[in-house]
Swiss-Prot record:
Function: Probable component of a transcriptional corepressor complex involved in branching control. Regulates cotyledon expansion and lateral root growth, but not germination or hypocotyl elongation. Promotes auxin transport and PIN1 accumulation in the stem and represses BRC1/TCP18 expression in axillary buds.
PANTHER family assigned: CHAPERONE PROTEIN CLPD, CHLOROPLASTIC, PROTEIN SMAX1-LIKE 8
Protein name as catalogued: Protein SMAX1-LIKE 8
Organism whose genome encodes this protein: Arabidopsis thaliana
Induction: Up-regulated by karrikins and strigolactone treatments.
Underlying gene: SMXL8
Biological classification of the source: Eukaryota, Viridiplantae, Streptophyta, Embryophyta, Tracheophyta
Entry GO MF terms: ATP binding; ATP hydrolysis activity
Family, as annotated: Belongs to the ClpA/ClpB family.
Length: 910
């Protein structure tokens, strides 16, 4: 039977009574006969200082905006209230009585409040004094009333439909986060979320209690103690804050800080190596067996030859190995390689990892039954609620633009092994491009830093002057002034403040770093993202010139663009326009750029807009483009992988939708798809190329010509001639290009003529359209379309954010001469050196294409030796070559295309 409102109020405090009165008003306005728990929830959410709404804001799903999820909650609540049947009309003085479910919630809260430890003594004294009236009328506080109402199944269903969990809300109300530790942009940590996170590296900002001690000395001692054991020497951290403890431990280990973690003496100098990010890429993105073998081979060499007690490998989260969406064979292979590494190098290799739940560990054991024994694992439970938020970390990426030092941390998947653990674990990424300074919370508004002293300021100025001399352009006055500014705002993607190292830290880094020592990988890690822009330039420039020869000027411009600080805090995207010939060099340099900045070649997306216009796919994976427009394909890839290099080839062929999206992206920092959805590009590098104009100099070789013959197999026919005066050696610079052997040149000319006649006949035999005005209209529309495209392209190229990178024509003639000399040397080595060799230009052309399209144009001698040595060995076996012989290699095209360059030539039988 319903309870009168006045009777129910006797059980509540003043604050709770006010909330109940508001719930009664909601029921009266809707014409309902009783006041239910849903009316109470509606009233509680509407209070000026709503504890329930504040709890919802902290446990909301970070995948949706707060406004969207609260609108969903209001909608679900309104629908549930509308389903309640209206009762008879009540008078103006009548109030809808409290329903049985709501009164039961009040009784439950009374009983729970009576059992609280802080209230137990008071109610015990009441019971001893036999004051039953006082005992029965326990005043229920508002917080306890909310907790009891959340237990109502109807209320739980409403919150569940809006994406909330009653258990999370209750825990959030019981343990409110203090103001100084509250991060409104992140989802708090709850035990019920631990097993439901599909991400490979679930990282959350801690839901903390102010009275807890965050000192990790005990956890550090426990981890170090496991390393010293003879059995079970590789710890696996399991717990809510396992990632935070692991990151702090490895940071201290990397900085050689033994205070607070009691590192044993025999472990001093232990080298920490991070392979977790690469394991995740190989299993979840794309598996490369050759790359994996090379990496583990390097790890083995580092374990054997490295100084100190050995190597500590951080393999990341066990969830990567057990995730059903990953590559299962790749996971099996990597697990076996880690086991093999431990067997080979014994006591010089340690392992460490972390996971948030024991269920993941059990799943790992079911999939790999021997891994606990092979890896010598020791479970280490982490019970302290250490914040998962690491301190300000940095890496080489921080010294690059598009980031320009504004990253305090980077996602773990962007880190290569051997680079340290400074930025391994961060919170979820959220864009700040559409936020202003005035709307930011107080802890994001400004952060002060210590003024630079005179000595440190001079050191910073000297570093900048060195960069100016290398790049050939000057810093603006505002950039120079910002060096000595008293305040600086450095907000990273996780909406947290990162401190800026002063000049003293820069000088310390300069004095301590020794870049002359050989490195195991081609990347470095700095102590601060703003350190050594000049050194960053050298690293980028060296990598680019090593991988792409003959384009030093282009490498210089790109290195300058990536080394300079960004003009805006919220815009770290870079736009490059590669102009000139050498299409292969442009693509290869962009790929190397992805490897340098994002530490992975899988973060490179290439789109050939010219091929897409002709209906030939235009991307590396044509199946993904099926049924989609090009702009939607690019948008999807950027949503899935915002840290990437987008390579747009033949940009002048872009359609109208892509033109609009690119124009908006370069202006606003948001890339839009065909449906109007947007994605931030603050961490993306756009590289655009256009079809190169024909150069004034005429050469025997061109990119188009080599592209047509790429991979086509050639049949080699050997002719031996004894007449010495009639032959020329391949050593002569003009002997190959000015001869036509066996009438092959005339045959090719005849074939081209026949094709021209066929095309002419097909054109003239078609049915003519006599509707001349329609034809003129089509021509006019096409002309206007091309004109608009040219205007758009001109405006894009003139944009201030777009950096023009000049490329020089590739020296095909010089490379051809090197190939001829290398072929002759190889022939002398395999056959004999006292006879002459004459090679068909067709064969030289195939070799030139093989070298030009290879991964490295510098290893010409080794590449040609692998291709031509089998050919010359067959010649030596099948023919009797004497001193007076002249060996002629005559080529004939076959309609066979091969990916393997080693089988490029087929030697015809005698």
């Amino acid at each position: 039977m319903p309870t009168a409102v006045n009777v129910a109020k006797q059980c509540l405090t003043a604050e709770a009574s006010y909330a109940l009165e508001e719930a009664v008003n909601v029921a009266r306005r809707r014409g309902h006969s009783q006041t239910t728990s849903l009316h109470a929830i509606s009233a509680l959410l509407s209070l000026p200082t709503s504890v329930l709404r504040d709890a919802c804001a902290r446990v909301r799903n970070s995948a949706y905006s707060p406004r969207l999820q609260f609108k969903a909650l209001d909608l679900c609540l309104s629908v549930s209230l509308d389903r309640i049947q209206s009762g008879h009309q009540l008078g103006s003085d009548d109030s809808p009585p409290v329903s049985n479910s709501l009164m039961a919630a009040i009784k439950r809260s009374q009983a729970h409040q009576r059992r609280l430890p802080e209230n137990f003594r008071i109610y015990q004294e009441m019971s001893q004094s036999q004051n039953q009236n006082s005992l029965s009328c326990v005043k229920v506080e508002l917080r306890q009333l909310i907790l009891s109402i959340l237990d109502d199944p109807v209320v739980s269903r409403v919150f569940g439909e809006a994406g909330f969990r009653s258990s999370e809300l209750k825990l959030s109300i019981i343990r409110p986060v203090p103001h100084l530790l509250r991060y409104s942009s992140q989802q708090p940590l709850f035990l019920c979320n631990l097993t439901g996170n599909p991400e490979p590296n679930p990282v959350r900002w801690g839901f903390t209690v102010p009275s807890l001690n965050f000192n990790g000395d005990l956890d550090y001692r426990r981890i170090s103690a496991v390393f010293t054991k003879d059995k079970g020497r590789n710890p696996l951290l399991v717990g809510v804050s396992a990632y935070g403890v692991l990151t702090s431990y490895l940071n201290s280990l990397e900085k050689n800080q033994t205070d607070g973690m009691i590192l044993p003496t025999k472990l001093h100098g232990l080298t920490a190596v991070n392979i977790g990010s690469e394991i995740s890429d190989q299993i979840s993105v794309k598996f490369d067996k050759t790359y994996t073998d090379t990496r583990f081979h390097d790890l083995g060499k580092l374990a054997e030859q490295g100084s100190g007690p050995g190597l500590l490998l951080h393999y990341g989260d066990l969830r990567v190995f057990t995730n059903g969406e990953g590559n299962v064979p790749a996971a099996n292979y990597i697990v076996n390689r880690i086991s093999e590494l431990l067997r080979r190098h014994g006591r010089r290799v340690w392992l460490i990892g972390a996971t948030t739940s024991n269920e993941v560990y059990e799943k790992m054991m079911r999939r790999f039954p021997n891994v606990e024994k092979d890896w010598d694992l020791q479970l280490l439970t982490i019970t302290s609620l250490k914040p998962c938020l690491p301190h300000n970390k940095s890496s080489l990426i921080g010294s690059f633009v598009p980031f320009g030092g504004f990253f305090s941390t980077t996602p773990s998947e962007l880190k290569l092994p051997f680079s340290g653990f400074k930025t391994e674990i961060t919170g979820p990424v959220s864009s700040i491009s559409d936020q202003t300074q005035s709307t930011l919370p107080p802890w994001l508004q400004m952060t002060t830093r210590t003024d630079l002293n005179q000595k440190s300021s001079a050191k910073v100025v000297q570093t900048k002057e060195g960069l100016e001399s290398v790049c050939g352009n000057k810093f603006t006055s505002s950039a120079s002034a910002s060096t000595c500014s008293a305040k600086s705002v450095t907000t990273d993607l996780n909406l947290r403040v990162s401190s800026v190292t002063t000049g003293s830290g820069l000088k310390k880094h300069l004095d301590s770093k020794d870049f002359s020592q050989p490195q195991s990988v081609s990347s470095y890690s700095f102590d601060n993202p703003r350190d050594l822009n000049a050194e960053s330039f050298k690293i980028i420039y060296r990598r680019l010139t090593d991988m792409v020869s003959g384009q030093d000027e282009a490498a210089r411009v790109i290195s300058c663009a990536l080394s300079q600080p960004p003009k805006s805090v919220t815009r770290r995207d870079v736009w490059l326009n590669l102009v000139g010939p050498d299409t292969v060099g442009k693509r290869r340099m962009s790929l190397v750029l992805a490897e340098i900045v994002y530490q992975s070649e899988h973060r490179f997306m290439a789109v050939d807009l010219g091929a897409a216009e002709q209906g030939m796919g235009g991307c590396d994976d044509p199946m993904r483009l099926r049924g989609k427009t090009m702009v939607d394909h690019i948008f999807e890839v950027m949503c899935r992988n915002p840290f990437c290099v987008v390579f747009l080839e033949n940009i002048e062929k872009a359609d109208e939708k892509l033109q609009m999206s690119l124009s908006k992206a370069i202006e606003t920092g948001k890339f839009m798809d065909s449906h109007g959805r947007e994605v931030g590009i603050g961490n993306t590098i756009f590289v655009m190329t256009s079809s190169s104009q024909g150069s004034a100099t005429t050469t025997s070789y061109s990119e188009e010509k080599l592209l047509r013959v790429k991979g086509r197999q050639v049949e080699i026919r050997i002719e031996t001639v004894s007449s010495l005066p009639m032959v020329r050696s391949v050593y002569g610079p003009t002997s190959v290009n000015k001869r036509k052997l066996m009438g092959l040149g005339n045959l090719q000319e005849t074939k081209d003529t026949v094709e021209s006649v066929k095309r002419l006949n097909r054109t003239t035999n078609g049915v003519l359209d006599l509707n001349l005005p329609a034809q003129e209209t089509e021509i006019e529309e096409k002309y206007h379309c091309e004109e608009n495209s040219n205007v758009w392209l001109m405006n894009l190229k003139n944009h201030k954010r777009l950096i023009e990178v000049p490329f020089k024509p590739f020296d095909f003639e010089g490379l051809a001469e090197k190939i001829k000399k290398s072929v002759k040397e190889n022939f002398d080595k395999c056959v004999r050196s006292d006879c002459l060799l004459e090679v068909d230009p067709k064969i030289i052309e195939r070799l030139l294409a093989a070298v030009y399209f290879s991964d490295s144009r510098k290893d010409i001698k080794e590449l040609l030796e692998n291709i031509m040595s089998p050919v010359f060995l067959r010649i030596k076996e099948r023919y009797e070559i004497t001193t007076s012989c002249v060996v002629k290699l005559v080529g004939r095209d076959l309609d066979i295309f091969l990916e393997d360059q080693m089988d490029l030539f087929f030697v015809k039988s005698q």
